Amino acid sequence: MEGLRRLETQEQSIREILSTLSIPVGVSIGEARPLSREGWESVVSLPFRFVNMYAHQMPLFVHQDGRIDKFVSIGPGYMLEQVKTIAEMEQVVALEAAIVSSQAKLYPFGLLDLSTITLISRLTPKPVFLRTQKRVTPDDMPLILKTGVRGITLDPSILEPGIEEYRDGVRGFVQWGARPDNESR
């Protein structure tokens, strides 16, 4: 509930920021505490276009609520049959592959990770996004996008700490996406 209380105290700022953006913006609800119906109503009262939650943490009242799109995060240990079933659900508009166990988060993105996101991307025609829980660089993107992944969610844990370092890390991916020779987009 603490995170949702912070959301409520920042409501005016959130509304102002979202009113200036032309891209869809969502909110990621973490695992601090189970989400209550009251907390959910606070979320949907804000102008977010989608909510992102792990499947094992998403209450059915969230899943069934048609007021907001659902991006469902797939964690390590989910069986492929579960992933396919979740992807087939009408209320789910996209999957986020958050497939890295906490022990492996400091390592570079590797071949096993690449093969796993390839499998997940092949299971569904819906968009699949990769949460960058391991070190991924802009140079890795052409190969990652060839798997069928439609984009990435930059996890701050892979970037250097500090505001300037974070900006530089994000800037590297933005510049990669804007390159005229980038045919992988």
Language model: regions and residue ranges:
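Glycine/Thr-rich beta-alpha phosphate-binding loop at enzyme active sites
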Residues: 1-6, 87-118
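Catalytic cores of alpha/beta
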Residues: 34-45, 78-89, 134-150
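Catalytic-face loop-and-helix region of soluble metabolic enzyme cores
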Residues: 97-107, 117-140, 145-156
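Glycine-rich phosphate-binding active-site loops on the catalytic face of alpha/beta enzymes
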Residues: 1-2, 46-61, 94-105, 145-167
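C-terminal helical cap(s) of enzyme catalytic domains, especially alpha/beta-barrels
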Residues: 109-110, 158-185
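N-terminal active-site wall of soluble small-molecule enzyme domains
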Residues: 2-45, 55-64
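Hydrophobic faces of well-ordered beta-strands that scaffold small-molecule active sites
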Residues: 1, 23-31, 50-53, 68-74, ...
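Generic structural signal for hydrophobic
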Residues: 17, 42-45, 63, 86, ...
